[in-house]
Every structure is written in structure tokens, then in C-alpha cells.
């Protein structure tokens, strides 16, 4: 492997090769049980209960519930989001690749971040009695820490699907289960979050969002622990490298396909955030609450059905 470093291959290339080449991995094309596939998919359900809430309701929560000016809320979400994409994401990927425990490389991160993820999710939707400037600082700190933990959880979680088995068919099947879990989370957020916030807050928006997030955070933490307990890393990449973190970051910057995918991903998430964040303002300011709930329910239900249909078609049903 070290000889390849002198022949134009970067450390990133070697990692990809080691994770995909039958000659460089130690694993069998093992068929995964339905229990393991469901257990793994619960991790994405857990993450998206929080992520979909952030995308759809965080801006609204900051401005209309916590009382942060719209300009400040936009700046917080935008700047911290970019830091998460361009700093937290690559650093956590490199750190996860250097992890070696009796549980594997990637599974431990799901375990280590399960409780912090839940706690920070609750704190991000908590409204302490602070001055205007203190609220802005509080939002910066909690949102930054939440995105850091999200990266520490979601990067290893996503990589885990590639080391559960070396069977391409089984990996595709796992992805299908995972996609269904994402759509279920999206449906829950779009259909149930606002009614839950009203019910659990007894008309108090701040208490409603806080209590709803406590419910989602508790569910998410439990699902992360189940994902950790029901999965096993079987593909063992063999990569001999003594590169530093700086070297790895340099390799990433020189890897044009990686840079393109990073930019496309960031733009896609910006689009999701804009669409999700603006929708609730439009329907709150121009339509009644009942129309808003019905509209969101229809979107969620239709997307859920379309997503399930696409998955079943892809699986040959």
C-alpha cells in the first residue's frame, strides 16, 4: 500500500481502494438479517428526527419563539452550517478512519454520541431567560455543538453501511431500509411536530417545542443505541498509512471528485434549508393554522408514499 503513495495515489484513494477491493479486505459476502437492517436503519430515523426539525423549524424557533432577530438567526444558521460542512465533516471523517476499538471503527461513534446528541438537541430548543445578546451567544454555542455531534455521529454511521458486509446486493438492501427510515422521520416531523408542540405546550410555543424535542431526543437516543447493538463491522480495510491529519486534508483538497461532491452536498442542504425554513413563515403569515397543518400533512404523506414506491421498485417489487 505504501508503494502506491509514490505512484500518484493519495491517502484518500487508498482508503477507498481498501474499502472496495476484494483483495484488500477481510470479509465475506455475508447476508444480513432483517433485524440488523432494521436496527441499522433506526440510526437514520433517529438522526433525521433532529435534522428534519432543524431544517424545517429552527429558523422559525429562533425568530418567533426564542426572540432572536431574523438577520441574526439567518447568520447563525448560515455560518455554523458552513463550518459544519467544510470543517466538522472532513475532520470527523479523518478521525473516524483513525479509530480502532473492539467494536470497530465506526460503531463506537454511534454509541459515544447517542446521549450527547439527545442532550444538545434539547438544549438547542430550550429558551432560557437571557438578554438579547446572550440569546444570540446561546444559539451560536448550542447549534455549533449540535452540528459537531451530528457530524461525529452521522459520518461514521454512514460509513458503517459499507463495512457491514462486502455484498453489493446486501449493501443496496441496507440502503433501501435506511431510505424508508428517512421518509418515516420526514413524515413524523411534517405531520406531528406542530400538533405535538401545541398539545405538549398547552398553547405555549416555547414549552411545546422544548417538550416535543425532549420526546424526539429520547426516541433518537434509544434508536442510536439499538443501531449500535444490532450491527457488526465485518469488512476490515487494510490501509497502512502514517499520514498526518494535515496530509489527509491536503489529499481531500486535491481530490476533485470529492470536492465536487462536497460542494453539491452543501448546495443541496442549503436548498433544503431554504425551502423548509421559508414554508412555515409563508403559511403562518398568509394562511390559517389549519391550512398550514393540512398542507404540511399532504406534503409529508405524498412524499412518504412516493419514497416507499421508489424503494419497492428498486427492490424489484
Regions found by a protein language model. Give the residues of each.
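Membrane-embedded alpha-helical bundles of multi-pass transporters/translocases
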Residues: 4, 8, 14-317
Amino acid at each position: 500500500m505504501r508503494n502506491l503513495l509514490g505512484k500518484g495515489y493519495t491517502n484518500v484513494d487508498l482508503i477507498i481502494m481498501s474499502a472496495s477491493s476484494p483483495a484488500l479486505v477481510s470479509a465475506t459476502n455475508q447476508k444480513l438479517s432483517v433485524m440488523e437492517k432494521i436496527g441499522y436503519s433506526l440510526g437514520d430515523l433517529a438522526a433525521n428526527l433532529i435534522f428534519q426539525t432543524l431544517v424545517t423549524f429552527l429558523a422559525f424557533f429562533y425568530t418567533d419563539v426564542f426572540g432572536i432577530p431574523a438577520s441574526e438567526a439567518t447568520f447563525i444558521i448560515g455560518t455554523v452550517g458552513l463550518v459544519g460542512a467544510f470543517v466538522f465533516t472532513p475532520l470527523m471523517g479523518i478521525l473516524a478512519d483513525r479509530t480502532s476499538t473492539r467494536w470497530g471503527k465506526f460503531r463506537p461513534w454511534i454509541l459515544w454520541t447517542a446521549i450527547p446528541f439527545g442532550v444538545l438537541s434539547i438544549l438547542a430548543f430550550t429558551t432560557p431567560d437571557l438578554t438579547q445578546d446572550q440569546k444570540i451567544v446561546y444559539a451560536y454555542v448550542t447549534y455549533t455543538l449540535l452540528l459537531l455531534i451530528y457530524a461525529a455521529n452521522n459520518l461514521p454511521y454512514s460509513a458503517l453501511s459499507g463495512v457491514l458486509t462486502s455484498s453489493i446486493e446486501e449493501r443496496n438492501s441496507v440502503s433501501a431500509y435506511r431510505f424508508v427510515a428517512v421518509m418515516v422521520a420526514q413524515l413524523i416531523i411534517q405531520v406531528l411536530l406542530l400538533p405535538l408542540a401545541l398539545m405538549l405546550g398547552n398553547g405555549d410555543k416555547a414549552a411545546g417545542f422544548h417538550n416535543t424535542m425532549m420526546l424526539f431526543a429520547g426516541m433518537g437516543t434509544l434508536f442510536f443505541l439499538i443501531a449500535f447493538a444490532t450491527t457488526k463491522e465485518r469488512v476490515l480495510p487494510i490501509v497502512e498509512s502514517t499520514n498526518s491529519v494535515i496530509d489527509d486534508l491536503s489529499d481531500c483538497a486535491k481530490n476533485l471528485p470529492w470536492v465536487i461532491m462536497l460542494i453539491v452536498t452543501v448546495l443541496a442542504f442549503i436548498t433544503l434549508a431554504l425551502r423548509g425554513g421559508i414554508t412555515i413563515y409563508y403559511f403562518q403569515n398568509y394562511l390559517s393554522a389549519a391550512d398550514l397543518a393540512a398542507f404540511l400533512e399532504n406534503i409529508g404523506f405524498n412524499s412518504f408514499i412516493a419514497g416507499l414506491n421508489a424503494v419497492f421498485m428498486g427492490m424489484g417489487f
